[in-house]
């Protein structure tokens, strides 16, 4: 990853697949997907039907527990997926994600 991307993102992303449930405003049921990379500040979710940039989302990331994340779509790649920026997480969820990422980095 180049330095400008790291600076723009704020934290390095790891190639890791994590199941995710995606909720949009007014949705009765979640969409299900998986991350292709993940960091403390965001992720990339693969999807053939990506959301438009600016779409607010609520995510449930399935790590050892379930993390609840409020997020916003920052990139939209047709037939590929979305870049997601995390905008709000509970402190304990941040710590669980940090621990998960540290352990994942050791195995890569």
Task: List each language-model region with its residue ranges.
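Short conserved beta-strand and strand-loop elements enriched in small hydrophobics
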Residues: 18-24, 54-67
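Short beta-strand-centered aromatic/proline hotspots
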Residues: 33, 69-74
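Short, solvent-exposed secondary-structure boundary/capping segments
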Residues: 44-47, 79-88
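Short strand-connecting beta-turns/loops that link adjacent beta-strands
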Residues: 27, 50, 64, 78-79
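N-terminal helix initiation/capping motif
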Residues: 1-40, 98-108
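A residue-level detector for short acidic-glycine micro-motifs
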Residues: 22-24, 37, 73-77, 88
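Short, surface-exposed secondary-structure edge patches
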Residues: 11, 46-50
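Extended Gly/Ser/Thr-rich low-complexity repeat segments
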Residues: 56-62, 95-105
């Amino acid at each position: 990853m180049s330095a400008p991307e790291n600076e723009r993102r704020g934290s390095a992303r790891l190639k890791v697949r994590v199941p995710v449930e995606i909720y949009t405003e007014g949705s009765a049921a979640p969409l299900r997907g998986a991350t292709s990379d993940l960091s403390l500040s965001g992720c990339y979710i693969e999807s053939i039907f990506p959301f438009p940039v600016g779409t607010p989302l609520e995510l449930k990331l399935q790590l050892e527990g379930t993390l609840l994340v409020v997020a916003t779509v920052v990139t939209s790649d047709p037939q590929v997926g979305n870049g997601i920026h995390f905008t709000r997480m509970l402190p304990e969820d941040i710590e669980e994600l940090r621990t998960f990422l540290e352990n994942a980095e050791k195995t890569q």
